[in-house]
Amino acid sequence: MKKLQLLAPAKVNYRLDVLGKRPDGYHELRMIMQRVDLCDEIEIALTDVPGIRVTCGRKGVPDGPGNIAWRAADALLKLSGKEVGIDISIAKKIPVGAGLGGGSSDAATVLMGVNELLGLGLTDERLMEIGVKLGADVPFFIFKKPALAEGIGDRLTALEEVPSLWVVLVNPGIHVSTAWVYQNLRLTTGNPITIIPRSYSSLDEVCALLSNDLEPVTCGRFPLVSEVKEVLLAAGARGSLMSGSGSTVFGLFDDENAARTAAAEIEKTRGWFAAAVRTI
């Protein structure tokens, strides 16, 4: 039985601009995204028993077709025309419904893994075309580089330079529906569209970039998210922002010691999920 063990990393958004609503109902976005080394652990195995089986064991994460990783495997299995089974086991380390892209990363990792196991030889570009039909963030995780993401998140441009940073992720245990956030977003008009640099050489430059148009919506419904930002800044973060549609907030720190100290203190005093991670 052929199998692979893979890691599916989380991501943070240093920038998330909502530029407008498209005729197809999606929103036109502009984002700066980078992966971090908090990872779900995924095992993919080919079996002689036809069908796809996904097991996760995390409350709120479906095991069947409702799981985006299942749909990723199904897309490639149908494309291959092969009569094989695929067993997928996911050990979730990334908080669910938290703005960290865990589900999209799982799907991207399954696409890449099944492509390898079945010997399909699909390029990353082709996998990204398949992935965007599963979720807007899926192509980014196949791209594997810090990126400027435009469109619905599917048009990706690699950043020319970005520093390696220590980041503290804090999740207060609130599940935020991305669909709800976008439904309650009030688009403003007349705001100048600033030019986003493609190169960042320091922590200060990244901190100056931090902005998320979805943050006021989520914080309006869940004031605790604003409190998390304040706690991170009080713990020494040089900058802090909600990632994606929330509820995870991240803080950028000067070094590993500062990040680990802050994460341990926040977890101890507040009881929230807190992890010191590094960008990749």
Swiss-Prot record:
Residues that bind ATP: P95, V96, G97, A98, G99, L100, G101, G102, G103, S104, S105
Keyword entries, A-Z: ATP-binding, Isoprene biosynthesis, Kinase, Nucleotide-binding, Transferase
Pathway note: Isoprenoid biosynthesis; isopentenyl diphosphate biosynthesis via DXP pathway; isopentenyl diphosphate from 1-deoxy-D-xylulose 5-phosphate: step 3/6
Keyword set includes Nucleus: no
Family annotation (InterPro entries): GHMP_kinase_C_dom, GHMP_kinase_C_sf, GHMP_kinase_N_dom, IspE, Ribosomal_Su5_D2-typ_SF, Ribsml_uS5_D2-typ_fold_subgr
EC numbers, comma separated: 2.7.1.148
Reaction equation(s) it catalyzes: 4-CDP-2-C-methyl-D-erythritol + ATP = 4-CDP-2-C-methyl-D-erythritol 2-phosphate + ADP + H(+)
Pfam family, one: GHMP_kinases_N
Annotated GO biological process: isopentenyl diphosphate biosynthetic process, methylerythritol 4-phosphate pathway; terpenoid biosynthetic process
EC category: transferase
Keyword ATP-binding: yes
Family label: Belongs to the GHMP kinase family. IspE subfamily.
Record's function text: Catalyzes the phosphorylation of the position 2 hydroxy group of 4-diphosphocytidyl-2C-methyl-D-erythritol.
Protein name: 4-diphosphocytidyl-2-C-methyl-D-erythritol kinase
Species name: Geobacter sp. (strain M21)
